[in-house]
Amino acid sequence: MSGEEKLGKLRAKLKEITEQIDDADQKKVEAKHALVDSLARLEKNEVEVNSAKRRIKLIEKDLEDSSERLKVAEEKLIKVEAEEKKIEEARNLLEEAESADDEKMYNIEEEFKESKRTLESNETKYIEAQRKGVVISRDVEKTRDKADTLEKRVAVLEQTIASAGESLVELEEREGESSEREEINEEKLIFLAGQFKESEVRAEAAERSCNVLERNIFETENEINTWIQKRKEIEDEMIEMDTVADEPDDE
């Protein structure tokens, strides 16, 4: 082989080596770039990892805070539920109280109506009692007047009886004085005896009438006292009802 051929081969070999070196340099540069990129990505990844760790810590802190807040919220919820239960119980008690108040108010209104009717009835009875009291008082006055009249009549009859008795005594004394007057005196004696008997009958009748009138007066006075007592009871009851009606309801 000639020297030119060897030189050509060497040149070709050198060129190949040069190209290989250039390729190696290019690969080296590319490898450096790749390394730089990898380092950059690694650094970036480390930053991201650190950031992720910080975020994880923050999330863990938030989770811990959230757990604490959740615990506090649960405690508040329990308190709220207890308060709601108390409020519900209070509302039920209030509704029951309102229902009881309504029933009580209805009963009070009914009692007031009944008291009003009783008051009106008592007022009517009071007026009737006053009217009857006036009538009875008049009857008592009339009865007393009749009793006075009868007592006067009894006194007159008693005087008449006394006079008749005296006349009988005088006639008996004069019986033996004159035989001529015997028949006349006997007739007078019979007449006076009849008057005496009649006077006695009238006196007894008058006495019975007086007794009846006295009983009537006694019964009438008792009736008047009864009506006075009833009127006082009615007046006291009316005053008591007026006092109760004027009192305010504290409940």
UniProtKB/Swiss-Prot annotation:
Expression sites by tissue: Striated muscle specific.
Pfam families listed in its UniProt record: Tropomyosin (PF00261)
Entry keywords, A to Z: Coiled coil, Repeat
Coiled-coil spans in chain: 1-251
SUPFAM superfamilies found in the cross-reference section: Tropomyosin
InterPro entries the UniProt entry points to: Tropomyosin (IPR000533)
UniProt entry tagged with the keyword Coiled coil: yes
Disulfide bridge partners, by residue number: none
Domain notes: The molecule is in a coiled coil structure that is formed by 2 polypeptide chains. The sequence exhibits a prominent seven-residues periodicity.
Similarity comment text for this entry: Belongs to the tropomyosin family.
Subunit structure: Homodimer.
PANTHER family: TROPOMYOSIN (PTHR19269)
Protein name as it appears in the record: Tropomyosin-2
Organism, as annotated: Podocoryna carnea (Hydrozoan)
Gene name of the encoded protein: TPM2
